[in-house]
A protein has these predicted regions:
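Acidic, divalent-metal-binding catalytic cores of TOPRIM
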Residues: 1-175
Length: 175
């Protein structure tokens, strides 16, 4: 797929793929990325680098959409060797968000796709899209965390457009 496409956007998971595809549609008159020769591929966090090696060899325009997981320096270090490669673009949120929510006595990670979408759009908008009625952001965070795919499908299929995190917009506009 990487060889055949005009450009690729590499994402971590299925939910990310659906959201990136919808963001593209919302900014490209309803066209799916593939209609413009752009393949959005779920490759998982550990295989990004192998795809980037191939993209570099082929000089293929490639964007990586990845979470910062609360450690931007770690992401920068991981992809440092691709900083100067013109055809490769690492798209990561430059902001580390924190909060008080705990899940099973562990700190909630506010630095993944779902919390970033909630931050951009607010609880009311997300309640409308998901058909839920949560009264706190923490409740919405828990719901989105445990229903990642359902939430991504709801966003993808919604008649309502949402706001997308800046790092996703960077990936789809980098043409």
């Amino acid at each position: 797929r990487l060889i055949l496409c005009k450009k690729s956007i590499l994402v971590e998971g299925d939910s990310d793929e659906l959201v990136v595809q919808r963001a593209y549609m919302d900014t490209h008159e309803g066209r799916l990325p593939i209609q413009d020769g752009i393949d959005v591929m779920t490759v998982g966090g550990v295989t990004f680098k192998r795809y980037l090696e191939i993209a570099q060899t082929l000089n293929k325009e490639t964007a990586v959409v990845t979470d910062n997981d609360g450690n931007i320096e770690s992401v920068k270090k991981k992809y440092k060797e691709y900083e100067e490669i013109q055809c490769i673009h690492i798209c990561v949120d430059e902001v580390v968000d924190t909060g008080d929510l705990k899940l099973s006595d562990k700190d909630f990670n506010y630095n993944t796709l779902e919390p970033k979408i909630l931050k951009e759009n607010g609880r009311e908008a997300m309640n409308n899209i998901f058909g839920t009625n949560y009264s706190t952001d923490d409740e919405m965070h828990k719901y989105m965390r445990t229903h990642k795919t359902d939430c991504a499908i709801a966003i993808f299929e919604s008649a309502t457009k949402i706001k997308y995190p800046e790092y996703i917009m960077r990936a789809i506009k980098n043409e």
